[in-house]
Amino acid sequence: MTRQILVGGVPIGGGAPVVIQSMLNTKTTDVEGSLRQIRALAAAGCQVARLAVPNREAARGFAEICKESPLPLVADKHIPIRIGVNGGSLDKRLLEKYGHPTAEALVESAFEHLELLEKQGFYDTCVSMKSSTVPTMVAAARLFRSKCDYPLHIGVTETGPVKQGLIKSAMGIGALLLDGIGDTIRVSLTDDPVQEVYAAKDILKAAGLRKEGVNIVSCPTCGRTRIDLIGLVNRVDEALRDCKKPITVAVMGCVVNGPGEAREADIGIAGGDGWGMLFEHGQQVEKLPYEELLPALLRRIEAM
């Protein structure tokens, strides 16, 4: 088990639940804009927000933001200290030693920074070692964890377009979480930071580390499908994105196999040719016209 630190009132490490982070893409000098984004992140489920503080003007903005932020904030200079090692900014000496940003180079850089802090008697530190290459990031985190117990912030950086970023992040973060490695995570996307939070929540749910929120299961469609299943699944996902009930909802493409295949779901819908059924634990509850399926599902979930 890792040692524990506190960021504001949020515990990181020491057996605490994995914490979701995101980073603002506003200018820290834009106090009101930054606060709006922080509030949106908090509403989505973010627990810690990071801001860039590159100069004194930004530091003044950061101070104002701290006064009203509903979330603990992390900046370049903040307590507790976060050591962030990135493959794109390694010391030239380490690049010459290892040839390129290897996992070993990232870990050695992290330990060099930790040693500087430990010599000053400071141990309240969280460490991050990120790479845009999934195997390198995973190997670095595993190597670091085998050597010490500082809490780890994990994530893949510079992940590319959103679809690629989601896959890379799910692979890298998910592999480590299933190994029991990782105390706080960020899914880095070239997108609205709120989408990073939703993705992080989905990864934690898929890894079995977070029960809060809806788990949607749906079939991949086949020749029996007689409804717009893709559109229906997307509408269900959008409608239930902020639902905090720990339930599994099935959206199936046919009434022949759908309810049986999704019998483990708490509730679900299956479509036929112009009609469909609402079911719970594989048993039919109601037969409905297709256009009434989604409203009926949402009403039933609301009443659960």
Regions found by a protein language model. Give the residues of each.
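Terminal leader/tail segments of proteins
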Residues: 263-264, 270-274, 283, 288-304
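Catalytic alpha/beta core domains of metabolic enzymes, predominantly
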Residues: 85-89, 94-244
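N-terminal amphipathic alpha-helix/helix-capping segment at the start of soluble metabolic enzymes
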Residues: 1-23, 32, 238
